[in-house]
């Protein structure tokens, strides 16, 4: 009887330890490590391709993130190109204001962890690339958890370090939109 109890106790301990380490491994405070919390199975669909997005592929697994690297005065990120206009590759209306935005507006979407459940909605952030800096307003989330559906233009979830910017931001920074991705730094204003 004591052996059965001991085995049950060890089994429960191992189950709890494994669950805790899995949860803790997705973000380790102080270390700034953000790891995938799961994987989304891909589903292809009608992906609008005006800004040459990556479109989901059936059966491919895409990492999901509930976290992003810590924000500093010079947070490293990847700038991607996105249209926030209706019918373009941005999908539905912006989450912050339930509206679409002109490609001439200085607006961005941030990865899920940086978006912080809408806490950065309406805030301006400073974006720096190639020695140039601009300010843009946060209007949307670049969803790092969900994707491969109509609401997300059949695009995979964003990586955890994305600043998805309008063509106006790219132009103001003097960047080539045809590249589609650029290393940047950003910070809260």
Language model: regions and residue ranges:
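Secreted/periplasmic proteins
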Residues: 2-189
């Amino acid at each position: 009887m004591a052996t059965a109890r001991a085995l049950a106790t060890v089994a429960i301990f191992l189950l709890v330890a494994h669950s805790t380490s899995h949860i803790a491994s997705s973000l380790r405070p102080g270390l700034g490590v953000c790891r995938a919390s799961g994987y989304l199975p891909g589903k292809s669909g009608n992906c609008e391709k005006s800004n040459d997005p990556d479109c989901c592929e059936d059966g491919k697994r895409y990492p999901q993130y509930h976290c992003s690297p810590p924000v500093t005065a010079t947070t490293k990120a990847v700038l991607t190109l996105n249209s926030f206009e209706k019918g373009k590759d941005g999908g539905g209306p912006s989450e912050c204001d339930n509206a679409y935005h002109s490609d001439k507006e200085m607006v961005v979407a941030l990865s899920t962890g940086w978006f912080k459940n809408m806490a950065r909605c309406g805030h301006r952030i400073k974006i720096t690339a190639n020695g140039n800096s601009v300010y843009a307003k946060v209007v949307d989330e670049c969803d790092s958890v969900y994707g491969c559906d109509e609401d997300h233009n059949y695009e995979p979830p964003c990586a955890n370090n994305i600043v998805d910017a309008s063509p106006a931001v790219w132009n103001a920074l003097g960047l080539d939109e045809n590249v589609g991705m650029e290393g940047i730094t950003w910070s809260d204003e």
